[in-house]
């Protein structure tokens, strides 16, 4: 390809990317981060932890903006003036108010106290991510690749998407046709090494837009007040005396 043609093609790509970015709204979310002192010491001090946290949030932002799957540009910004190192039980940090921030992220690489229960997303007015690893007495870095894949998944909850893996149906528990359903490919199904948001996740995140949301409220809000079921014969004519049975499926 001639050099002038190559330059023109590259310029066109840059202009197209800039136009797309300009056409999309930017949603900025302020994040307060706390980490346990033992992890800071194990990782080499505060400056090193700041660097690792910056790298982690670059990956979080990339996950939300990769491939322009969503209608907006997402920017999760750590407030470094509010960044803190805590002592004691990490579970005590989760429910602390953070009125000046959209989200609180509590990291814990040494989860050994019995009160330090499972990590994950805490919604319903708490708006916090408990970013902790295996419950044992050894150090588990919250900055490993799989750990960051996990926190991307938790930010998916923060933006309104429920666990897709919780919707799976085992074949022996499907009384309709006996088929299994394992869920679709998505960060919200199996996040490790995954970059794709499913169509369902994209629609939920887009629906949440720039609001701070609770998953249950968001899901309930998109359902109609009434659902009408029509039953037809093979020739598409309305069936008479049809019986419709609903089989509830509990999540998890």
Protein language model features and the residues they cover:
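Residue-level marker of regulatory loop/turn positions in helix-turn-helix DNA-binding domains and
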Residues: 144, 148, 163, 180
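Hydrophobic h-region of N-terminal signal peptides that target proteins for export
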Residues: 12-22
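Bacterial N-terminal signal peptides that target proteins for export
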Residues: 1-10
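Catalytic Zn2+-binding segment of zinc metalloproteases
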Residues: 149, 154-172
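Sec/Tat-exported extracytoplasmic proteins
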Residues: 60, 64-68, 155, 159-163, ...
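Propeptide-to-catalytic entry region of secreted or membrane-anchored zinc metalloproteases
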Residues: 23-147, 250-252
């Amino acid at each position: 390809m001639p050099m002038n043609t190559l330059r023109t093609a590259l310029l066109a790509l840059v202009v197209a990317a800039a136009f797309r970015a300009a056409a999309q709204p930017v949603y900025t979310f302020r994040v307060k981060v706390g980490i346990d002192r033992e992890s800071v010491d194990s990782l080499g001090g505060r400056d090193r932890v700041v660097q690792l946290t910056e790298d982690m949030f670059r990956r979080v932002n990339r996950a939300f903006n990769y491939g322009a799957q969503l209608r907006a540009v997402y920017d999760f910004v750590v407030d470094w003036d509010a960044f803190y190192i805590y002592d004691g039980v990490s579970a005590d940090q989760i429910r602390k108010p953070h009125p000046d921030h959209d989200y609180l992220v509590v990291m814990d690489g040494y989860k050994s106290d019995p009160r330090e229960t499972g990590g994950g997303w805490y919604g319903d007015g708490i708006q916090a991510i408990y970013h902790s690893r295996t419950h044992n007495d050894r150090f588990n870095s919250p900055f490993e690749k799989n750990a960051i894949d996990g926190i991307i998944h938790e930010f998916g909850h923060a933006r309104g998407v429920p666990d897709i893996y919780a919707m799976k149906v085992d074949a022996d528990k499907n009384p309709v046709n006996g088929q299994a359903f394992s869920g679709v490919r998505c960060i919200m199904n199996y996040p490790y090494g995954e970059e794709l948001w499913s169509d369902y996740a994209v629609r939920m995140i887009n629906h949440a837009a720039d609001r701070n949301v609770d998953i249950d409220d968001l899901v309930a809000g998109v359902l109609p007040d009434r659902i009408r079921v029509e039953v037809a014969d093979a020739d598409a004519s309305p069936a008479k005396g049809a019986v419709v049975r609903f089989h509830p499926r509990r999540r998890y």
